Amino acid sequence: MDCKVVSLNEKDQFIPKIKSSDPVITGLFQYDAAQQTSFEKRMSKENNGREAALANVIREYMSDLKLSNEQELNIQHLANGSKVVIGGQQAGLFGGPLYTFHKIFSIITLSKELTDTHKQQVVPVFWIAGEDHDFDEVNHTFVYNENHGSLHKVKYHTMEMPETTVSRYYPDKAELKQTLKTMFIHMKETVHTQGLLEICDRIIDQYDSWTDMFKALLHETFKAYGVLFIDAQFEPLRKMEAPMFKKILKKHQLLDDAFRATQQRTQNQGLNAMIQTDTNVHLFLHDENMRQLVSYDGKHFKLNKTDKTYIKEEIINIAENQPELFSNNVVTRPLMEEWLFNTVAFVGGPSEIKYWAELKDVFELFDVEMPIVMPRLRITYLNDRIEKLLSKYNIPLEKVLVDGVEGERSKFIREQASHQFIEKVEGMIEQQRRLNKDLLDEVAGNQNNINLVNKNNEIHIQQYDYLLKRYLLNIERENDISMKQFREIQETLHPMGGLQERIWNPLQILNDFGTDVFKPSTYPPLSYTFDHIIIKP
């Protein structure tokens, strides 16, 4: 597999500004992610003393998996005080978007580079956001159908949308297998298809909860790298979090004030507010089989779906004795994660790192230092066919990744058309505009006639526009094969107006290039970069 790095002219300059150590952006974080001294400082930080307990919890969480030697070693390293690089993601259907895998590769790559540079073992940890309850965000994925040259949405259907956390959700296995079958119907059959289908079927048969199936697929893919997994909703982990839940409840108003102040500061720097929340407690409580947002009305802590209320002593007692009923929101999850782990760096997507920029004062309030916040690696897969099509139409890859192919497609259509025809129609439009101006001069001062002339002009312009559009549409139809090829480039490299990794599913890559495509023996070694990586399988 070949690998190259390209620099894109990105519309969103947040990550390029991190790369260039822009003082406005780096000032939002504790550390400058582009400076080696930041890593030296984090690597030398004292540990928090929770590493041995965390190692036991992670071992228990992964006990239903057959651990690799690399994972066994990393659990031992963690227990002995090794620091971590961490990142997480929601448990998406069949692995979710490709960027989930790329986030894990980011964690692996940075962990290895830090281990090699500092001669200290750094452990890669992936945090599964099983506490989330927005099932609509994880119950679907997309698959590219080569025969149709288009993407198709594949969704796991439920009679009722679950309101509990995804870790507490147990999908119907027959329905899930039908969803899997639908996905494979759209994918082309390759020599890898049957083996991949068997792996997925086995995971569905062997595991019951939504997040356990997600974990098993990730484990199957990344165990050889030594990645450790933990679910935010895992009960033994929640028990470790009890002291922090109590602190959050006691300081909830100060926490909310700190968050709002930091968010306002980011807006003053010209950034849009990323975190949208009405709560002033920033925790959820599981009650009546629903994940319910907690807020404080000045006297009571109140749940948003059942209107159940608690006085402070009651809710703190729940945090102490039943911490598994609590879960974090977007504000407190990063805080809890860093309180638990001895983290060198947190790896996040473009939106995630903007969330973290709104939390600096929250970390300081709880005397927890924000780690280095690193943008994850961004990766696109370029197969031989798409590369040949780019060459055929002389389209720069970097341009497609940023803008898509619509501009190049329109240019191609006009090149196939009669230039004289287009020029004459456009000339008639310009002539009509001049005529309209002359006629308006003739009827100046008479509003009825002005309206009549303008309406007549509008009709003529519409007719010429229609003539030109229909003519170009006919050219499109005459070049149907080329139009399909442009669509193929678009759906592969810039699907739904964004990067491939945000839409495509990992199963598509596994099916096309083999079930070992992401394994160390096949996948190219990566170097950490803020630029874009192109991989040719």
Swiss-Prot record:
Output this protein's name: Putative cysteine ligase BshC
Entry keyword annotation includes Ligase: yes
Write the gene name.
bshC
The protein's job, in short, is: Involved in bacillithiol (BSH) biosynthesis. May catalyze the last step of the pathway, the addition of cysteine to glucosamine malate (GlcN-Mal) to generate BSH.
Please name the top-level EC class of this enzyme. ligase
- Which InterPro entries does the UniProt entry name for this protein? Bacillithiol_biosynth_BshC (IPR011199), CC_BshC (IPR055399), Rossmann-like_BshC (IPR055398)
The highest taxon in the source lineage is Bacteria
The Swiss-Prot or TrEMBL record describes its family as follows:
Belongs to the BshC family.
Entry EC number(s): 6.-.-.-
NCBIfam families for the chain: thiol_BshC (TIGR03998)
Coiled-coil annotated spans: 422-450
For the keyword Zinc, the answer is: no
Which UniProt keyword terms apply here?
Coiled coil, Ligase
Task: State any single GO MF term.
Answer: ligase activity
Cross-referenced Pfam families, in alphabetical order? CC_BshC (PF24850), Rossmann-like_BshC (PF10079)
